[in-house]
Amino acid sequence: PFLVRVEKRADGTYIPGRMLSSRDMGRDEKHADFRYYVVDDKTGEIVIPNGTLAERWSDQEKWNIREENRDTGAEICPRLSVWDDKTGTVEVELPYFGNDREKRTLTRALPVRSVQTADGEVLVTTVYDLTLANYAIDRGIGGESAGSYEDDTPYTPAWQEKYTGIAPELVIKTAREIADNAIKTNGRTMI
């Protein structure tokens, strides 16, 4: 659920940037480049949780995974997506590594939220939103997305068959079995 900057290039296209850090927000503190933000689902505010990389080298003993606001100690619930409070959508260019010399990037639609930083307004999204965009999950916001498992779109079961020789039906069946096992074991699934 960490926030990632979405940056506009000179040609007008958008690309994922780096994580939104404490330094971006103008905070002058030790290891500020490694204190990353999430959206707290309870308040809608952006906060730094315990356990970021900076805490590993900190003296404050907050190198843990408790869902707490690092600054206040208040309990937080990191929001997976900016979908519910998005200020818009943009199409991002994502690197494509699928053996196609003609196609080097994938264009995907992405929900974004505007955040005021020390250097002005920037667009952010979550790692989760980027993952969904990369895998062409159709969220009804446009872009190149897969309408079904049978679409020959990068990362779908139909697409992978030409690279692996594994039938799409088998991939779908296996994925459903893993998901079913995860439900039955409360997430204690190994692949």
Stretches found by the model and what they are:
Residues 1-185:
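Long, well-ordered, tryptophan-enriched scaffold segments
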